[in-house]
């Protein structure tokens, strides 16, 4: 699981099966590993793409619009899973940063968990 530092600090305890996963956390400040958590402070996208070429399971990018935008710019996202929280805030941050290229998606699945719609998309043409 790859996540930004803020998402890591906010959500780690609520992630399912967190104890069984390996976490890569993007952080501007270098830190020593903590158990199954490795902090990445250099070129996070390049480090994760190097892992993608190795045998193993899927890489999951969790939370962090800035981090997700970096991976979208690198054309490194195969699937998108987006949860929509049922809260109207009136204003807020964008999900993704401005300036990322358009990506055409196909809705593969829609489920609802505890009142939260979860939309699963694949890239069109891949």
Identify the residue ranges that each predicted region occupies.
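Enzymes that bind and transform nitrogen-containing heteroaromatic metabolites
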Residues: 1-126
């Amino acid at each position: 699981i790859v996540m930004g530092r803020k998402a890591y600090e906010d959500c780690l305890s609520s992630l399912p099966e967190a104890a069984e996963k390996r976490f890569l956390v993007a952080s501007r400040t270098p830190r020593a590993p903590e158990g199954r958590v490795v902090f990445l402070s250099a070129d996070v996208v390049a480090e994760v793409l190097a892992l993608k070429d190795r045998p193993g399971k899927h890489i999951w990018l969790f939370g962090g619009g800035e981090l997700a935008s970096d991976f979208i710019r690198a054309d490194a996202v195969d699937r998108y899973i987006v949860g929509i929280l049922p809260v109207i805030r009136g204003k807020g941050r964008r999900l993704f940063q401005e300036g990322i290229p358009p990506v055409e998606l196909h809705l593969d699945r829609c489920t609802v968990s505890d009142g939260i719609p979860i939309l699963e998309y694949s890239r069109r043409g891949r």
